[in-house]
Amino acid sequence: MSSSSFLPENNEYLHILKIFRTFALAFSLHKKIMNLSSIRTMNQHTLLSPFHFEGKGLHTGLHIHASFYPAAPNTGIRICRSDLEGQPTYPAVADYVAATERGTVLEYGEWKVSTVEHVLSALYAMGVDNCLITLDGPEMPILDGSAKYYIEAIEQVGLQEQDAPQKVYAITEKIEYTSEQGNQMLILPCDHYAAQVTICYPSALLGTQTAQLDDLADYKQQLSLARTFCLVREIEPLLRRGLIKGGDLQNALVIYETPMSQDDLDFMTDKLGQPRLDANQLGYLSPLNYPNEPARHKLLDLIGDMSLCGFRLQAQIVALRPGHSFNTKCCKQLREKILSEQ
C-alpha cells in the first residue's frame, strides 16, 4: 500500500516520458543479442515448515493472526479465512481483485482479504511458488509496513524443492499499458525478472524518484525495508472514511510536507494514539531506510501486484506512476494473455 501520485509539471513529465520510451527503443537492440525463445525453468518450491505472525491490520485496526504453511505442487498461493464458516480458501490471482484503494483487496463472496501486496511481494521474491496462508480476519497484518519480517521468516524456515516445474512465462514481445491518468507500463523481454518504477509527486520532499531491481536476489537488501508511506494531509480524510484505523508511525513512513495548524495536527496524532508533533517541523516523521524509500516501496508493491498473474515472469517491467489500481489492471490483462496461450 502506498499513496497515490499526481502529474508533475509538463516539462518534467515530458522528460520522464522520453526516458520511459528509451526502454522500448532499447528492446529492438536487446532482441538481437538475446534468445527470446529460451525459458529458464527450475522446480517449484514451498516452505520447509510453517511460520506465524500476528498484528493489527492497517485499515481495520483488528488484531489478526496469520499462518503460512507448505503446500502441494501446483497449488500456488492460496488464502484461507479461518474465521468464516467453511473456512473459504481461494487463490491469490488477479481474477479476485475487487478494490485497490490504499492497497490491493481480493474478494469472492464473503471471502475478502485486504493489503495482500507486501506478503505476495516477499513470497514471489523469495521463490515461494506454493503456500497456504490462513487468516482469522479480513486483512493481512501490516507489521512495520515493509516486507522485512516476511523475508526474515522465509529465510528462517527455508524452502523445499518440489517435483514439479515452475510455471514460467517468458515475455517475447514488448507489451505496453497506459491509462488516461498518465500511468504507463512497459513489459519487455528479459532472461530473468527485473523491474523499475518512477514516481512523480508535486512535492518538494517526494518530487520525482526512481527505483530499480536488477535481480530478485537483491530484493532483501534493496527493497525489503521500504515501508508503505502516506502524507499527513491525507490522513484526516482517510480516518473520516474509516480507513487506516491501525496506522501509526511504527508501520508507515509518514511525510509532513504541507503546513497545518497545531490544533489539526494534534487532532490527528491523538486520533492515531501517537505522541504530538511540532507543526512547524516539516519532513519525514521517522528516519528513512533508503534515500528513495517511497519509490522503493512502490517497486515492492508492483512486484506483489504483478505476482497475481499466477506465473513466474521472465521480463523487465518498467512502470511510470504505478499504483495498485493500474498495476492490477495491467496484471489482469497479462494473466488473460498468458492463459489464452496455454
Q: Could you describe each region identified by the protein language model?
A:
Residues E9, Y13, T22, A26, ...:
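Short, positively charged and aromatic/hydrophobic N-terminal segments
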Residues L17-I19:
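Catalytic cores of phosphodiester-bond-cleaving enzymes
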